[in-house]
Amino acid sequence: MSNEKVALIILDGYGIGEPNGGNAIYMAQTPVMDRLLQRWPHTKLSASGLDVGLPDGQMGNSEVGHTNIGSGRVVFQDLPRITKAIEDGTFFENPVYAAALDNAANGKALHILGLLSDGGVHSHIRHIFAMVKMAHDRGIQRVYLHCFLDGRDVAPTSGAGYVRQLRDYCAELGTGKITTLQGRFYGMDRDKRWDRIEASYNAMVCGEGIQDPDPVHAMEASYAAGVTDEFVKPVVCVPDGRIQSGDSVIFMNFRPDRAREMTYALTQPDFDGFRRKTVAENLHYVCTTRYDEKLTDLPVAFPPEELHDTLGEIVSAHGLRQLRIAETEKYAHVTFFFNGGTETQYPGEDRVLIPSPREYPTYDLIPEMSAVQVKDELVKRIRTGTYDMIVCNFANCDMVGHTGVMSAAIQAVECVDRCLGEVVAAAQEMGYTLLVTADHGNADRMVEPDGSPNTAHTTNLVPLVLVGSDLPLRPCGRLSDIAPTMLELMHIEPKPAMTGESLIEKS
């Protein structure tokens, strides 16, 4: 049987929200999507929480969404993966953590670094507690905690409460001292603002900063000065708790981007971001996840799970041609993340990057972004008849949704709808079956209940419309079901690793 041609069109940030004035998708004129929903089989997909490998109730995002779509399975993300390890006890047996604690047991200190909150974006306080418990259970005597304060992913003055929790937990166990405090502004920079990293480094390695033996008092003093958690200036609470040569250091953040610079400053002999007054050499340094592929000398407690037999890999193995196309903002999502977190470009896989507009500071000023250019190039490629599978992302509903500007979000939705109309027409003309869907919601809720702008993703379901086929669909599913559906349409058997289920109703 010959392979059917299939195109997947991902409308980023296009969720199914309440039919009200705060929903840009509902308020927009969308004649194309309306027509598709009226004519073709469609269903609703879960794109958040446990259904995409995130904690229950947590909104999805583009990275997670595309990984689940492209791999055809629920891929547990770092936060629930580590939390699950704590719950089943494997965290406390992790050989990478254990080796660092063994080093500390031989006369060295253990330093635990991490963002102290339950925001769940970069870290989780529960994971820090678990590391203190592991150190206690293994009899580590000198345990020093270097706490970055949040104030972005949680309330701006919630830090004092987290500091109290950690202080009390350490006192209860008789293990660990809060040694330094500082806002994430300093120790978690990601934009090579090395003066910030230097101030943080000097507190942890040199003992320089505001001196206050009481971490809770230090927080209250910062608030009294009008400085909230994110911007708390480095405080040293335990002067003899400096990071010194040969010590063990465990960075508990699981999100790499804001852990990378500090890791380089603490570990790399050729680091040149600033002149280090003191260098702590031969640290037994552990990254909780892989912070940078270049840091090959550092052990990783939870290395990335390798995803094999993804949609792109299977299609390539059948000798078929595929196209990935998006503008800059979502290009990594239809390539790197869609392929399971690997830079590998499979045989027969072509990639097209359309530049996102750079001359505007925010996308509410250009809600069409580069959608028209993406559409034009996609239609041109469709008409060649070259590709057996196409994956395209339109970024607008997500990126403009993030601005919180309702009028711009409506324009973004309408622009995407017009582009979708031309893509569908060309694809049907060339014999493609299309799946029109989204990776998560955003523009479907632009306004909070109190009337303030909502700039975040939503936990709403997302649509999936099967255009060009009257095969009946299951009434609900999740993002990981898209890949097996596409393979069924292409008459290709999925691999066992692809645990998602086809959305096509079994007769």
Model-derived regions, located:
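Feature captures the catalytic ectodomains and active-site-proximal regions of enzymes
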Residues: M1-S507
